[in-house]
């Protein structure tokens, strides 16, 4: 009987692939080719295994398709290895195809509704150079966590965890060159060299990027004042160019099976520039007795709209260095720890000459700034296993930031400002994870204390300030895993603290009729998110409710003493609510693998403006379609399309 069992297994494997539930269907196996006997083989008895000649197998081929996307607890997992994504040229190209990720107008990637994610590479926060030269073929999977746990900083909106395979042993080198063309050309060249043994890994990297893109940005601001409505507008055309030189050295040493140490250095040299041409215009309120229903061209004191042209050049330079030491330890079967020590130094400067013309009048303005910052930080994470399904994570971190800077402007009211910043932060967290049967859950609490000081070095100034923040951040998640369904419900609180550029009381020049000033009364923004995720077969969906208290937004005002100018500043607003729905579907049809994403976010928000309640309710939606075609000789063709309607974000409305 043994021979028939072996033969049946081979035939079944050769003629089917796994179904959605992971089982092997046998409908394709022909019963005529399987022989069965009732006799059995006794212990210590030799058995001769024979196969029916008609059923002999010349070759065995197993064909199957694993889904690229699946839910794991409250995270979306994207499989890269052995999927079409493994053939994408760069990590950026892979991230574009992760459901929930989208590319902004300036080319950066963000998570829908949560901003740019914090990226971890094998559970260590990744540097920009690491991500730039990461070999896509080494990536196993990428986790998108939209409800990060208590161990993550309270300002973190989303987390990307990239898990890779270890590089093969030996000496290796890789050179990569790629070119991107839209309106203008962007090119990138990089070289990676390394030496890997069972215990030691030494790698070095150098990369150069010439990044260019053009921007067309029309913008209007309708400013309500006591004497009526002012209109200020800009039609901006910009050309942007940046040259990056990035270097990195990594040394990892596996001291034993339980301990690993490493050191890393990253350097970045950036030179960038932007040239801009603008046509700007403004209009006063209608004079008394003016017909407000007629065309709005003739509405200021002189009887017509005012126009002027502006040209500017902005050049920036940045130099940064980052050192990292780490120790990973497994002290016992149930106890492990991670320790990270970091030092970073950043130095940048920029200058911006502006020329503005209105008729025969011309005004020139020069803005310049520079800053130097040093950052020291340490972090420890401990994991204690209680049992196979229960564990406790706890840890803490400390950081110190010291910096100083200087801003100069030849414009009226501005002059020169020198300042100094000093920030210290301490944090601690505790998180419990458990599970019973089909259910898993986690619950965590995080505490953060932040002290921030700003000192104006130019003169004794009321701008000098010190702020203290003490906040608690709870979070939890619960998951139900069934054979065909996956359900997850999670909650998280986050914060966004105002920067000193928003608080200091400084004045920044934007144009001859627009200045930006700070607001020292700003409060932190607190956000509460409740998320439900579900997966069924090829479909994944998400519903999210977000409440934001004390949102920080721009407002525009017209000073009574200078009516030709308007002032942009920051202000806290009351409750804003957002409702988001998301759907993803993907399937395999022979050589064609389509994947469809769609999301919609509805915003509820209103503002009392000069006694009138103005509603900024509105919907924002986007959709994308990715198509992968498997071609002969291991080639792949991919076609993608995406669209969004711009929509309403806070008080600002965007066009597609």
Task: For the regions a language model picked out, list residue spans one by one.
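Face-selective signature of the C-terminal outer-membrane beta-barrel domain
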Residues: 246-271, 307, 311-457, 479-486, ...
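Short, acidic, small-residue-rich periplasmic hinge/interaction motif at the N-terminus
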Residues: 21-84, 104-106, 145-146
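Outer-membrane beta-barrel signature, preferentially recognizing the C-terminal barrel domain
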Residues: 420-423, 464-469, 495-549, 566-580
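Outer-membrane beta-barrel translocator domains and adjoining extracellular loop/strand segments
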Residues: 188, 215-228, 274-304, 349-359, ...
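Short strand-turn segments of transmembrane beta-barrel domains in outer membranes
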Residues: 81-82, 169-193, 235, 421
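N-terminal periplasmic accessory domains that precede
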Residues: 59, 91-94, 109-110, 129, ...
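Transmembrane beta-barrel wall of Gram-negative outer-membrane proteins
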Residues: 184-212, 227-276, 318-331, 476, ...
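Periplasmic plug
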Residues: 71, 102-147
């Amino acid at each position: 009987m043994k021979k028939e069992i072996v033969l049946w297994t081979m035939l079944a494997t050769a003629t089917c692939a796994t179904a959605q539930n992971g089982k092997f269907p046998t409908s394709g196996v022909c019963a005529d080719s399987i022989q069965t006997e009732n006799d059995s083989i006794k212990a210590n008895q030799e058995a001769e295994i024979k196969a029916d000649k008609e059923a002999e197998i010349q070759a065995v081929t197993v064909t199957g398709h694993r889904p690229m996307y699946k839910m794991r607890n409250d995270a979306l997992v994207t499989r890269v290895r052995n999927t079409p994504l493994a053939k994408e040229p760069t990590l950026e190209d892979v991230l574009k195809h992760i459901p929930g990720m989208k590319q902004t107008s300036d080319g950066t990637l963000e998570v829908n509704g949560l901003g740019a994610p914090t990226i971890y590479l094998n559970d260590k926060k990744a540097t920009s150079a690491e991500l730039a030269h990461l070999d896509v073929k080494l990536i196993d999977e990428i986790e998108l966590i939209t409800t990060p746990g208590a161990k993550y900083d309270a300002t973190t909106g989303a987390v990307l965890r990239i898990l890779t395979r270890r590089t093969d042993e030996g000496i290796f080198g890789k050179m990569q060159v790629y070119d991107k063309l839209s309106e203008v050309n962007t090119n990138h060249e990089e070289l990676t060299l390394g030496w890997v043994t069972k215990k030691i890994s030494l790698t070095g990297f150098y990369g150069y990027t010439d990044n260019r893109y053009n921007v067309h940005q029309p913008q209007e601001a309708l400013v309500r004042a006591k004497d009526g409505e002012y209109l200020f507008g800009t039609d901006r055309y910009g050309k942007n160019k940046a040259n990056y030189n990035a270097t990195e050295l990594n040394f990892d040493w596996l001291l034993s099976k339980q301990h690993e140490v490493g050191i890393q250095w990253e350097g970045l040299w950036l030179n960038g520039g932007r040239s801009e041409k603008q046509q700007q215009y403004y209009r006063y309120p209608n004079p008394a007795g003016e017909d407000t229903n007629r065309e709005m061209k003739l509405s200021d004191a002189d009887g017509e709209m005012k126009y002027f042209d502006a040209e500017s050049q902005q050049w920036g330079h940045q130099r940064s260095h980052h050192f990292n030491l780490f120790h990973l330890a497994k002290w016992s079967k149930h106890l492990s720890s991670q320790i990270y020590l970091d030092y970073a130094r950043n130095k940048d400067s920029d200058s911006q000459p502006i020329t503005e013309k209105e008729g025969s009048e011309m005004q020139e303005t020069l803005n310049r700034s520079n800053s130097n910052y040093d950052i020291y930080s340490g972090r420890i994470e401990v994991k204690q296993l209680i049992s196979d399904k229960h564990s406790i994570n706890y840890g803490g971190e400390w950081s110190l930031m010291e910096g100083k800077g200087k801003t100069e402007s030849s414009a009226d009211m501005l002059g020169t400002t020198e300042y100094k910043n000093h920030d210290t932060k301490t944090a601690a967290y505790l998180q419990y994870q458990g599970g019973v049967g089909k259910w898993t859950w986690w619950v965590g609490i995080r505490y953060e204390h932040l002290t921030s000081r700003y000192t104006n070095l130019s003169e004794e100034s009321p701008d000098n300030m010190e702020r203290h923040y003490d906040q608690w951040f709870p979070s939890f998640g619960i998951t139900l895993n069934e054979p065909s369904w996956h359900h997850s419900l999670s909650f998280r609180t986050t914060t966004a603290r105002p920067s000193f550029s928003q608080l200091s009381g400084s004045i920044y020049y934007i144009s001859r009729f627009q200045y930006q000033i700070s607001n020292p009364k700003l409060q932190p923004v607190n956000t509460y998110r409740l998320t439900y995720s579900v997966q069924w077969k090829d479909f994944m969906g998400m519903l999210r409710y977000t409440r934001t208290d004390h949102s920080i937004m721009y407002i525009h005002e017209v000073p009574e003493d200078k009516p030709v100018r308007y002032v942009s500043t920051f202000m806290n607003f009351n409750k804003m609510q957002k409702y988001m729905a998301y759907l993803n579907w993907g399937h395999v049809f022979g050589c064609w693998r389509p994947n469809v994403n769609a999301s919609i976010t509805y915003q509820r928000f209103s503002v009392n403006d000069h006694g009138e309640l103005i509603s900024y309710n509105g919907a924002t939606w986007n959709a994308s379609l990715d198509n992968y075609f498997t071609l002969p000789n291991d080639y792949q063709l991919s076609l993608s399309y995406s669209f969004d309607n711009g929509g309403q974000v806070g008080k600002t409305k965007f066009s597609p």
